[in-house]
């Protein structure tokens, strides 16, 4: 499966395309409103 590289901004509609997890500025859990505004980035696999 194609996936986005680490440090790529992940939005709510594409967070499952990260190679690892989608991490937000306020912690490891991607909250919907943070993902809508582009505050989250792909991170390493857990």
UniProtKB/Swiss-Prot annotation:
Signal peptide: none
GO molecular function: toxin activity
Expression by tissue: Expressed by the venom gland.
Disulfide bonds: 3-19, 10-22, 18-42, 24-40
One GO cellular component, as annotated: extracellular region
Domain of life, per lineage: Eukaryota
Segments for region (Keys region for toxin activity): 31-33
UniProt keyword terms in alphabetical order: Disulfide bond, Knottin, Secreted, Toxin
Subcellular location(s) of the protein: Secreted
Domain comment as written in the entry: The presence of a 'disulfide through disulfide knot' structurally defines this protein as a knottin.
Similarity remark: Belongs to the neurotoxin 16 (SFI) family.
Function: Insecticidal toxin. Causes flaccid paralysis followed by death when injected into Heliothis virescens larvae. Does not induce any toxic effects when injected intravenously into adult mice at a dose of 1.25 mg/kg body weight.
Name of the protein in question: Mu-segestritoxin-Sf1b
Source species of the chain: Segestria florentina
